[in-house]
């Protein structure tokens, strides 16, 4: 089968012929229908030092996927051939302290799909059956593939109460747009969105006409938000961009006793003035790691079932897997939404 493989620590990927994986008694074999490019895939493509420490060489990358079960292990009873599934990227053991405490996303023995073990930029992928989310039969492959990143955004939004709150989302890439949509549906009274890339600004304004979109390079974002909130600031800041300046702004515009959700991963350590921005404000700072297995995906399903947010327009480009170089060049430009690859 064809697969996108990270073959060295150098930047880039290779499209290679590899064997179709053999499954164990508790596994399923998935015929991949669609996979979207994640920010972590971009870091692996670029060989960003902070990510490469965790990458096994060689490894098939990719994890945001929808596929059809075509083979079932002898001990699997929860899935059958023909089921449409998305894999949970964090392969959890089910036996460690955190797994048994209901926090499998913190598994002490975890493997990461497309990072430490083979992923889903391929024609077929092997997954433990317990790590598959089963979709309704009528779901589109594209929607199934973005279920997991939707989960990351929803986890960032719902890490604490958002209903009746004002929210600022920092970064209007795919996760940021998902977070804006989720915040609106789950009851945010007013949403601000901050972004510097012109195409992403245009997309945010087109998708969410009622959201106040601010370009911090063109106006004083802190002043604009404080004036719009009677000098109080927002109840919730959700930082998704990973930008050091955006992170500082997220605290500056925060109301006293407000909440900051940290979703984006900075490329370097960031210095904060904790006294005025955290201690005096009694700010609550919540790190967001992926999503809560499986609670968050039920929340994603609830979000979609409302019919009030369609995430598919966030997908802006689609490529066959053979054109991966073009797709990743576009993804690294910061001028696209979600990008899909098809085997």
Where are these regions (language model features)?
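Residues at the starts of beta-strands that form the adenosine-phosphate
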Residues: 2, 166, 189-191, 259, ...
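N-terminal glycine-rich cofactor-binding segment
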Residues: 5-22, 39-71, 86, 106-116
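Glycine-rich beta-strand-centered segment in the early N-terminal region that forms part
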Residues: 21-35, 50-97, 136-138
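C-terminal hydrophobic helical "lid"/dimerization subdomain
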Residues: 31, 248-252, 294-343
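NAD(P)H dinucleotide-binding glycine-rich loop of Rossmann-like/cofactor-binding domains
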Residues: 93-170
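Adenosine-nucleotide cofactor-binding segment
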Residues: 169-170, 184-249
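N-terminal Rossmann-fold NAD(P) dinucleotide-binding loop
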Residues: 176-177
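Glycine-rich phosphate-binding loop and adjacent beta-alpha segment
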Residues: 206, 243-306, 343
């Amino acid at each position: 089968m064809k697969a996108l493989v990270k073959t060295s620590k150098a930047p880039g990927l290779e499209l290679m012929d590899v064997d179709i994986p053999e499954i164990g008694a508790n596994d399923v074999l998935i015929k991949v229908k669609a996979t979207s490019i994640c920010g972590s895939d971009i870091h692996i493509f670029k060989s960003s030092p902070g990510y490469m420490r965790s990458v096994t060489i060689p490894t098939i990358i990719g994890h945001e996927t929808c596929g059809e079960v075509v083979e079932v292990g002898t001990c699997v009873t929860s899935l059958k051939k023909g089921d449409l599934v998305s894999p949970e990227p964090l392969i959890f053991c089910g036996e460690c302290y955190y797994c048994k405490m209901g926090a499998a996303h913190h598994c002490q023995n975890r493997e990461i799909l497309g990072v430490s073990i083979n992923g889903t930029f391929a024609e077929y992928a092997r997954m433990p059956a317990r790590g598959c989310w089963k979709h309704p039969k009528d779901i589109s492959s594209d929607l199934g593939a973005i279920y997991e990143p939707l989960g990351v955004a929803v986890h960032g939004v719902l890490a604490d109460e958002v209903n009746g709150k004002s929210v600022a989302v920092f970064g209007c890439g795919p996760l940021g747009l998902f977070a804006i949509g989720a915040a609106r549906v789950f009851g945010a009274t007013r949403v601000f969105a901050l972004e510097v890339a012109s195409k992403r600004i245009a997309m945010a304004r087109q998708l969410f006409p009622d959201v106040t979109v601010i370009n911090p390079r063109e106006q004083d974002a802190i002043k604009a938000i404080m004036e719009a909130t009677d000098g109080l600031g927002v109840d919730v800041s959700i930082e998704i961009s990973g930008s050091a300046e955006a992170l500082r702004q997220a605290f500056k515009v925060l109301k006293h006793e407000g909440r900051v959700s940290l979703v984006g991963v900075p490329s370097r350590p960031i210095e904060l003035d904790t006294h005025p921005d955290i201690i005096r404000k009694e700010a609550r700072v919540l790190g967001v790691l992926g999503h809560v297995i499986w609670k968050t995906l039920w929340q994603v399903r609830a979000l979609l079932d409302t019919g009030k947010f369609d995430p598919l327009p966030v997908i802006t480009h689609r490529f066959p897997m053979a054109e991966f170089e073009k797709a990743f060049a576009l993804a690294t430009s910061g001028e696209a939404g979600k990008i899909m690859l098809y085997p």
